[in-house]
Amino acid sequence: MSDKSYLKWPFFEQRHRALEGVLDAWAAEHVSQEHGRDVDEACRTLVRSLGASGWLAHAIGGIAYGGASDVIDTRTICLIRETLARYSGLADFAFAMQGLGSGAITLFGSEAHKQRYLARIVRGEAIAAFALSEPQAGSDVAAMQCAAVQDGDHYVLDGEKTWISNGGIADFYVVFARTGEAPGARGISAFIIDAGTPGFEIVERIDVIAPHPLARLKFTGCRVPASSRLGDAGQGFKVAMATLDVFRTSVAAAALGFARRALDEALERAMTRKMFGQTLADFQLTQAKLAQMATGLDAAALLTYRAAWQRDQGERVTKEAAMAKMTATETAQQIIDAAVQMFGGLGVVSEHPVERLYREIRALRIYEGATEVQQLIIAREILRNREPSGDAPTKA
């Protein structure tokens, strides 16, 4: 059983601790790492199950639309992702994409948008997607080429999106396109586009190291009502960054879940595997490795739940979320690699729990901003907040 002493930290309220306990019991009964080859159907099934059991109520903000509260509680999102990730990467993915795909609607949607989409998300009746990346514009959002030209009370979209999670199974997509109000990032707007809209097609399904629904999208003369725009024209970059600020911290939490499962597997292995007349755990080398794994996990968790707590206090957490995402994913990679090593040859057998975790975490170090992008964000934030002293160095 995983160490849950972190739940005693002051970042959490009693409601968070109670929720984690209920979810852990639910996941133990309803979530399996085995989902077969059809990840599309497995993902749909997980979304329906998460909706029917009430967990998707935490993915949106708005009690009027079925949400658990009027605002998205970041600590709750993080605890749910960490707990689900301990059991199944696909279950974590299914929950997370419902939140990320609809997050822009929670934050910037009109009343009509919220009425139409959020309640369906909560019930697990609709699947959401967040379409930002392009073939030539991943981390560099300002280089976006997909364009939306206004034509009366409609916009006409042309261009492509790629690496879109839930691509091919989503019922609607939050799509970002260049509308030209200003150069660079200030000339982007966000739109809600339903699957099946004429001029919108899925042109490629993408297979990746940790299987989940992923696709390349193409828009060719795709007409959408101007009323489908989220926020004001030219506000798309703000919409994207605000949404990512909420959910980037939760990526760190998913990494914690993977790492915690790996540590659990490693501890069990160390205590039961015998060689040279003693268990692995009796060797000082093994003890040192386990100590490093546990310490790294706690350090990453402290950064993650600090960022979540700060965001729930209404603070801007661009730097803190980047620190959490970078540290948790990189640390989890190290912990999982150490667990694989502890299992020896068994650790690289396909579908072994630690082999599966190894594939899951490698992708997470890239999704929603690679480690190198997080480093740039952190550096930009600390440089922005530092005033030059103005003192010239003295000569000896």
Language-model segments: what does each one mean?
Residues A143, G196-P225:
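Flexible, small-/acidic-enriched active-site or ligand-binding loops
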Residues M1-R86, F108-H113, R120, G124, ...:
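Alpha-helical interface subdomain recognition
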Residues H154, D158-E201:
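A short core secondary-structure module
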